[in-house]
Amino acid sequence: MTNAHYIGRFAPSPSGELHFGSLIAALGSYLRARSQHGIWRVRIEDIDPPREVPGAAETILRQLEHYGLHWDGDILWQSQRHDAYRDALAWLRQQNLSYYCTCPRARIQRIGGVYDGHCRTLQHGPENAAVRIKQFSPVMQFHDVLRGDIQADPLLAREDFIIHRRDGLFAYNLAVVVDDHFQGVTEIVRGADLIEPTVRQISLYQQFGWRAPDYIHLPLALNEQGAKLSKQNHAPALPEGDPRPVLIAALRFLGQNATAQWQDMHTDELLQYAVDNWTLTTVPESASVNPAFSNASC
C-alpha cells in the first residue's frame, strides 16, 4: 500500500550518463521512499542547455530501469516548466522580494566572491541584468535527518543570490524549489555536495510561504585521488551488464548490512530485500572511495 504522505525524488541533470556517485543518490532516495511505502518521482533538470549532452536524458532513464529503479508517475522535465518559473519570478517581483543586478562576475570576485547587495537600491531594469532575491530573513542552519543540525556559512546565507541568470536561464535554486513544491516532495535525499545551497532553498520556501521538505544528504563517492566522482571528473558510466554487483557495492557504500544471500538474488529481489531492511542510522556521513566499483570499472 502506497503512502501518499511521503514523496521523494531523484532529479539528475542530463549532462552525461549516470555513474556510481549518481547511483548512490538515486538508490538512497529510492530505498528511503520505498521503505516509507512512499512515492518516488524522477525529474530531469534540463534547464541549462549549454551543459546538456544530446541523448543523455534518455540514457539516464534507461539506466534507472536497467538497475531496477522504477519510478512513479510521469517524468517531469524542467524544460517544460518555464511558465511556472516565470510566474514565480513575477510573484517575487510584485512582492518586492527581488531586484535586477548588472554587476559583472569580475566585480564580485574582486570583493571576495560574495555579493554585497550593490544593486539592491539602484532600480535597474531587466536589460542585461540578472535577478537576485532580497535576503531579508536568511536561514542560518537547517536540520538534516541523517547529520543533525548543520550551520550555514553566514556570508553565503545572507547573500542576495541569483534566481534568474543574465543569459536568460532560470537559476537552479529557483527551479528546484518551484518544482519540488509542485510535485509535493516531502523529503529530499541527495548527495552531500548539495548541502551548501540548502539554506538558500529553504529561504526561498519561506519567501513563497511554502513548507520546506525534510533533507537527507548522503555521503559522496570519491575516486582514488580523493575527488568526488562526477561527470566533470570523467567518472565512468554505470556498466551495462549485470546490475547486481554494482547495486551490492552501492548498498555496502550506504552502510547496509550485507548478507551472503545478496549474491544469489535477482535484481528485483535484491532491491526489495534492501527496501525491507533499509536502515538510515547505518548510512555513513563521510565521503569515501569505493574500491570495488573503481577496480571493476578500469
Swiss-Prot record:
CC per GO annotation: cytosol
Q: Which parts of the sequence bind ATP?
A: 231
UniProt: L-glutamate binding residues: 9-13, 45, 172, 190
Q: Where is this motif: 'HIGH' region?
A: 12-22
The family assignment reads:
Belongs to the class-I aminoacyl-tRNA synthetase family. GluQ subfamily.
Name recorded for this polypeptide: Glutamyl-Q tRNA(Asp) synthetase
Q: Which NCBIfam families match?
A: PRK05710.1-1 (NF004312), PRK05710.1-3 (NF004314), queuosine_YadB (TIGR03838)
Annotated binding of Zn(2+), by residue: 101, 103, 115, 119
Co-factor binding comment: Binds 1 zinc ion per subunit.
